[in-house]
Amino acid sequence: DMFDDIFGNMFHGGSASGRSRRTSGFTGGFGGESFKSKGSDIKAGITVGFDEAAFGGDKVITLSNPENPGQPGQSLKVHIPAGIDNGKSIRLRGKGMPGTGGGEAGDLLLKVTVAPKPGYERKGMDVYTTVSVPYTTAVFGGEALVHTLYGDVMCKIKEGTQSGSKIRLRGKGIVSMKDSSVHGDQYVTIQIEVPRNLSPQARQKLKEFEEICQGSSRTA
């Protein structure tokens, strides 16, 4: 199909190839009258970074024609809405197939793929991370430095915190696409660091601690 060959384009700068969906137009009607028909939409894909999807912004992609690989491609500015997620589409109106009989052009639909970010997992508007805390901090309580999309924060670790416990950071998740005043949350899973290569003194103190705990459990 000639249109597929022309518009089966490659998008550079964070996107993949796309194919057009063509609908028939009618021209040369009765008495030579021309019937307007809107052009078909083109569907393609675009990959955006984790932070780009979270905060939004503008991204420039290049639309190239495979029949003229030596010619410079057409540059398009794409606005990434803050909060967009995997599988959502961005519509660029009038950037699809040309219409017939003077009809308007179709649209370009870019299906979004959000690239992963090490240490972060997204589920809807919520973000999930982990933080490692020393054994002593878990026992006695303290604070731990937690990375968020909005910068680092110090989180309180309660005395006697168990491995696998979760801390909820309200409003540190992804912004809602429908209401910019609404944000998801960040859930931080606690991982307790088991001490290694203990000094003889530390080992002795830990043994004493173990004996005290065992004694307490017997008398309880």
What is each PLM-predicted segment?
Residues 1-71, 77, 100-104, 109, ...:
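Post-J-domain flank of DnaJ/Hsp40 co-chaperones
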Residues 74-220:
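Intrinsically disordered, low-complexity linker/assembly segments
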